[in-house]
Amino acid sequence: MLTSDRGLSEEQRMMRDTCRAFVNDFVTPFIRNNWQREWSMDPKDRLPREILEQAHKIGIRTLGVPEEFGGTPVDPKTEVQTFAMISEEISRGDAGLSDKLVQIWKVSVLLRNIAPRHLQELWFPRIAQDPSFLLSHCLTEPRGASDRWLPYDVPEAMMHTKAELKGDKWVINGRKQFISNGYDAKLYVVYATTKPGAGMTKGTSSFLVPRDTPG
């Protein structure tokens, strides 16, 4: 747990203290009083809405969402450090909750940095307004994971999941596994090969896939 204020901005100190209070006053007591739900097979018990609503209320759920869409503003120069600091604080109460939030931040930053404007306008308001809106980053496959982004850009390291343009629609076929928020997300970023033989950096595309997409 980060205990020193050295190098932290006033904004970061305030966020850290808010998260620390959230863990001490809400997360830890909730986990202690509801530990049996850890073993429940009921999907409704996997991630209690009460926790997400409280995380939403204090602004940590929407850290990667632009302020114009209702997100929590973060200094871009120290954004990564802020994410790490808050993740550490939340993990003190529950590592699973921290991972849930990290996935939201990761995908939100992707949307913010590379998604076209019309997709930002479509999805960011939904993410910002719905406390139960989770996001998921679908990279890992049965035969490999993030190591594919290492600098050996050869065709053999490409995704087995493939996407083909048929008419005006992309059709994705393949398998993903070990996907954080996989059971609960409402929107997924799915990585798939679109140019076989071109290598990872030039032959892979990312697709936004809503949960209710047929297939």
Region spans (language model):
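Amphipathic, small/basic residue-rich leader segments at the start of a protein or domain
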Residues: 1-101, 119-126
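Buried hydrophobic positions in well-ordered alpha/beta secondary-structure cores of metabolic enzymes
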Residues: 12, 23, 86, 116, ...
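N-terminal glycine-rich flavin-associated loop
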Residues: 98-120, 145-147
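A short, Trp-centered hydrophobic/proline-enriched beta-strand micro-motif
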Residues: 131-146
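Hydrophobic, small-residue-rich alpha-helical packing segments that form membrane-like cores
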Residues: 144-146, 152-155, 170
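A structural signal for short hydrophobic beta-strand segments in well-ordered beta-sheet cores
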Residues: 161-164
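A short core secondary-structure module
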Residues: 173-215
